[in-house]
Amino acid sequence: MAAKTHRTAAHPTVLSTRALNRATLDRQLLLRRSAMSAKDAVAHLLGLQAQNTKPPYFQLYARLTEFDPEELSALMESREVVRIVTLRSTLHTHTADDALTLRPLVQAARERELKTFRRGLEGVDLDRLAAVAEELVVERPRPVKELREELLAHWPDADPFALTVAARCLLPLVQVTPRGMWGRSGQVALTTVEHWLGRPAEPVPAPDATVLRYLGAFGPASVMDFQVWAELTRTKEVFERLRPRLLTFRDERGVELFDLPDAPRPDPGTPAPPRFLPEFDNLLLGHADRTRVIPAVNKGRNGVGNQAYGSVLIDGFFDAVWRVERDGGTAILTVQPLRNLVRDERAEITEEAARMLTAMTDATDHDVRFGTFLDYGD
């Protein structure tokens, strides 16, 4: 049964946190696994956060039926998907088409990022730096260390790290294969997305189409939700332009939410099976108000310091962390609950964990445990 959405212009329907949770999980392919291809899923989700090499594979395993990691690896090898810095200055796995459109959309944010490094770039002509770096990486993909040394030869008084950050911000650089491939990753080597794909990037697009796609994957959502996800500013006018095509709701705090008229909004009581998400899954990062997935009491509890861990969704909400260790041929998956779990929840989590270990590791034996490995210092 779908959630009720009766409303008037003066009194939009209020969507509860559970209603938002179920709607978002459905669109994120986490309420039930989808039969879509890996490439279609990467496009539907507007990319997979990929600052580490393995999480994109686990993101797709959590969302797709019969997912084979080699499918995504083959897409990388054929250059149908690429690893490129886009949203929130973070490396993402995108389809080739999205890499050529989303990067221009967020380019202004990447250039604003350079202000943080202006002291280390004193005396550096940024236009010339971009030209020099582009010539270097188009000649052949360059490891980061080599690119840094080449740039430092031109600007010996500049901060070496700031020079490579500037190249990354000014140019749409991709990490070429074998980096990021399943089971056979290599060092980071960079070239431009246009050179790697053999076609030019698109002109800077209007955000309208991206807003609609975002709502299809993360909605219902507010203007601020979109801005946090994309790291864009001044997009309220875009939502106003799209308003005649959208439905509007309110959350329990009174914040206006926008949504596609035909998007799924399941009944809040719809069962949500346990799902194991890797570190930095965009589900957990794609909104300004993350309480639709992360209970307030668990904010910031998917890691300690700079170390992030996987998140377990239990009844649709982040209520446990997980990690995998190897002991010889045994894969040991430890789940640390953040609340008391009933027997049925533990059984369902154990079953899902065992399936994941079978599909995503080459271990001959699996051991699923409930225990404590994170000390939050409470």
Task: Show which residues each predicted segment covers.
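Long, low-complexity intrinsically disordered regions
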Residues: 1-290, 296-378
